[in-house]
Amino acid sequence: MFQRARSSRLPLKLSRQGRRYSSHYARTPEPAPPEIAHLIATYAQHLPRPLTLGTLLATGRPLTAESVQTSVSYAQAEIPRRLATRIRSLEGLPFIVGTNPYIARTLNGFRKSFLWSATYPAVKNLEENAAFATQLETLVQDHANDIPTMAKG
């Protein structure tokens, strides 16, 4: 690391070895705000309820206001749980993976969607269900490219 100058009268000089690394590319992922982190922790404690084929068939026929209400209640309970699980998984990745901009973008999208789904008011009638379904379609479109985006990183 230190080299003697050719003349013994000159001081030691420091030679650089290795590469220079910049923190420009590897930014620390933004932590979730405390209120969101607490909400995520609350939902992540509960395991997702499985959805069986029998349940799907029983819920869909005949289509009544009650079956629609049952379906939307299930969706409102499960979407935040499953998003919280995914968020926890992404937050648990090693630091170097979490600094990847594609992973960080997906994580932020999951957090935004989680906050929306966890704080959405309970659906009580068919009109509210239509509005919820429209918002849910937008949410699905927002996450349509998550897997290809994460594959880039």
Question: Where in this protein do the model-derived segments appear?
Answer:
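N-terminal mitochondrial targeting presequence
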Residues: 1-47
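Signal-transmission coiled-coils
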Residues: 33-153
